[in-house]
Regions:
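Accessory alpha-helical DNA-binding modules that contact the DNA backbone or grooves
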Residues: 31, 43, 47-148, 476-615, ...
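Low-complexity, acidic/Ser/Thr- and charged residue-rich accessory regions of DNA metabolism proteins
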Residues: 138-150, 206, 228, 245-264, ...
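A glycine-rich phosphate-binding loop feature that marks nucleotide/adenosyl-phosphate handling sites
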Residues: 177-184, 313-317, 373-378, 398-405, ...
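Long, charge-rich intrinsically disordered scaffolds of nucleic-acid metabolism proteins
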Residues: 97, 396, 402, 407-477, ...
Length: 709
């Protein structure tokens, strides 16, 4: 166990005490958000990512150790376990390395080599290794059933040697390192007709050293191969590898040459290639999943536009645009269908203008949220025209990815059983502006569309990572227990789908929950669930101000004592001044609290009911419309980062297609990844670098024209 902890400590840069604390709390049923927020003094203020890394690595090392024990036991049963082999297995850091060491002892299916051994050809194999002048003559002595001639017997003997040589652990390890450092992964066009949009054109004749392969290229090659467009291969320094293997023999003859050739080309290299491709894919998937997770986190943290009446606008050409007005709380007020763009007639378009203007006036619409899908550019122009008469109203282009998934879901049907799918989408688009987090948690995060090659990675690992991000953000922000949907509540630490639905049902039957203590009355919500969830649930209606903060009920008594010592009766300016000036270290000791816990309590008391998303960028509000034909190279624009990928970032500048900032145009300094400079949701100033009107593509730069010279 100590060695495992030492490995975790070494890899993650955490102390043995931190590891033990995290794993002990987890074993007791504590959730990651709870540990990160309410056990800082025990963990040394580890955040959610660090805590999850400890838990994940512990699980991975446990699986590795279990496999080592199983392998050692099987080799021991054969009586072939040496001290050197045991040590090599015990120090192996990868499962693949353990399997390589186990390979010579692994129970094999019936191979050519095993058949040859059973036929008694092993002595002939040994003769090949000696300087025998006439092997063919000697081989005649080994003719038997299945090996009717001396030539066939020699072939069987070669098979025995090929298997033995190809399982040489040292040679396989040397070959693996050689391929990793010097071999190239290649791709050739296999069937260009399957690549109608020429997405894979740059890979029709491609090669790159294995050790420098970028993750997005690995995933692109995998996809191209899967679609039948590309043929993937390797370029090796084969002669050098053959020379490695030849050093195992003291004599040279045609049979040994054959043994070396077959071992390398038929056995070892194909196995190493499979391993390398698996490792490249795993590394690429890990990077893609991390990137998607980072993008999702930033999207969920976009500042909400609270307290605004919003009109959701789901654009379409032929079937008409679906509109939905929601009040400041997100409650649907009305829905309507209009025909604002061609092929609608001129009369229909004029009627649509009047209908939109009437809705704005009747319901006091403050912002129009336009989905960025089909017909969004034309719809933006239409809305901008109408807003000339409403200078106080703005519009925003909203990323509608996943809105159609939500609108067709069981959750949406329960919420709006009498509405069409399209009208539900319009409501979702409007609500995304008011509270992105509350609305986006209703959608499978894989459908939100802020990733790269997300359909080409392990869906299980992707789901686990994205769910972790959603859980983390929801608990960091906190949830209003009286307004949250079951979908949002289910991400609160300690709560599951059943308990979340029970909370909503309890609200409907008993009215608003007025204190955290009352939450205990919800069916199926036991003591452990309450402990984990309570601090993340907010109750603005409570008479106890602490119920609308991140202060955990377990610390209410300490806070009362704090108020008593500081003579605080209300959280006015005088009280805030007292809280800011107190000595945390001394007061923490007096209250029997950890200093980190007291710091968090004070932060909550200084800003009760705070939403830390308010410190992030809000969406860009627009009143006019921009067309790609209006752009000129060198033009300065404001935009919002919509997606970050390995090679750059896509930015909404108010036209139909997002513009691309290539990584080379992000900084005057060298950067390894775009995420070092921008994040999803960032407001950025960009300059137009290149315009392709025909393909509707715009290249942007974060560097002013004079900075790129």
């Amino acid at each position: 166990m100590d060695k495992k902890y030492e490995k975790i400590s070494q890899d993650l840069g955490v102390t043995l005490k931190q590891i033990d604390t995290v794993l002990s709390l987890t074993a007791e049923g504590a959730t990651i958000p709870f540990i990160a927020r309410y056990r800082k003094d025990m963990t040394g203020s580890l955040d959610e990512v660090a805590i999850k890394a400890i838990i994940d690595l512990d699980k991975s090392l446990t699986n590795l150790n279990d496999r080592k024990e199983a392998v050692l036991a099987k080799i021991q049963e054969q009586g072939k376990l040496t001290k050197e082999l045991e040590e090599a297995i015990l120090v192996a850091e990868k499962l693949a390395d353990v399997e390589e060491l186990y390979l010579p002892y692994k129970e094999k299916r019936r191979t050519k080599a095993t058949i040859a051994r059973e036929a008694g050809l092993f002595p002939l194999a040994r003769l090949i290794l000696q300087n025998i002048v006439d092997l063919e003559k000697e081989a005649e002595k080994f003719v038997c059933e299945g090996f009717a001639t001396g030539k066939e017997a020699l072939t069987g003997a070669v098979d025995i040697l090929v298997e033995a040589l190809s399982e040489d652990v040292t040679l396989r390890s040397m070959t693996y390192q050689e391929v990793l450092r010097h071999s190239k992964l290649t791709s050739q066009a296999k069937d260009e007709s399957l690549d109608e949009k020429q997405v894979f054109q740059i890979y029709y004749d491609f090669s790159e050293t294995v050790g420098t392969m970028q993750g997005y290229r690995t995933l692109a090659l995998n996809r191209g191969e899967k679609l039948g467009v590309l043929k993937i291969g390797f370029e090796h320094a084969t002669d050098r590898i053959l020379a490695f293997f030849a050093t195992r023999f003291k004599v040279k003859n045609a049979y040994i040459d054959e043994v070396v050739q077959q071992s390398v080309k038929k056995k070892v290299l194909p196995a190493i290639e499979r391993r390398i491709r698996t490792e490249l894919t795993e590394k690429a998937e890990e990077g893609a999943i991390q990137l998607f997770s980072d993008n999702l986190r930033n999207l969920l943290l976009v500042a909400p536009l609270k307290g605004r009446v919003v009109l959701g606008f789901d654009p379409a050409f032929r079937t008409g645009a679906k509109l939905a007005v929601v009040d400041a709380t997100g409650k649907m007020l009305t829905t309507q269908v209009i025909y604002p763009v061609k092929p609608a007639s001129a009369r229909q378009i004029e009627e649509a203008k009047k209908d939109l203007a009437d809705l704005i006036g009747q319901y006091g619409v403050e912002i129009i949220a336009i989905g960025n899908g089909t017909a969004s550019r034309e719809s933006g122009a239409f809305v901008a025209e109408v807003l000339k008469d409403f200078p106080e109203v703005s519009y925003v282009i909203v990323n509608e990815s996943g809105a159609s998934v939500y609108s067709a879901s069981e959750l949406a049907r329960q919420e709006f059983p009498d509405l069409t799918v399209e009208k539900r989408s319009a409501i979702s688009i409007a609500r995304r502006l008011q509270d992105p987090l509350a609305e986006l948690v209703k959608i499978d995060p894989k459908s939100i569309g802020v990733g790269q090659y997300q359909h080409d990675v392990s869906q299980k690992k992707l789901s686990e990572s994205l769910d972790f991000v959603v859980d983390t953000v929801v608990n960091q922000v906190g949830v209003n227990v009286n307004t949250a949907s079951p979908a949002l509540l289910s991400h609160v630490a300690g709560l599951n789908k059943t308990i979340s639905e029970n909370i909503v049902k309890y609200r409907e039957e008993e009215g608003k929950i007025t204190s955290r203590a009352q939450i205990k009355k919800v069916p199926r919500l036991g003591a452990k669930a309450f402990e984990q969830a309570a601090g993340f649930l907010r109750i603005p209606e409570s008479s106890n101000i602490l119920d609308n903060t991140g202060v955990h009920p377990e610390n209410y008594t300490a806070v009362k004592e704090l108020f008593k010592r500081l003579d605080i009766k209300d959280l006015n300016e005088e009280a805030q001044s007292k809280l800011k000036s107190l000595s945390v270290k001394e007061m923490a000791q007096e209250l029997d609290l950890g200093p980190e816990t007291l710091k968090d309590i004070i932060a909550d008391l200084l800003k009760p009911g705070r939403d830390f998303r308010d410190s992030f960028d809000a969406p860009v509000l627009r009143q006019d419309v921009l067309d790609i034909k209006d752009l000129v190279v060198g033009q300065k624009l404001e935009g919002v980062v919509r997606n970050v990928v390995d090679f750059g970032a896509f930015v909404d500048i108010g036209i139909h297609e997002d513009g691309l900032i290539h990584i080379s145009h992000m900084s005057r300094k060298f950067i390894k990844h775009p995420s070092q400079v921008v994040s999803v949701g960032d407001l950025v100033t960009v300059w137009v670098k290149k315009i392709d009107t025909e393909r509707e593509k715009v290249n942007l730069s974060l560097l002013a024209p004079n900075e790129t010279d």
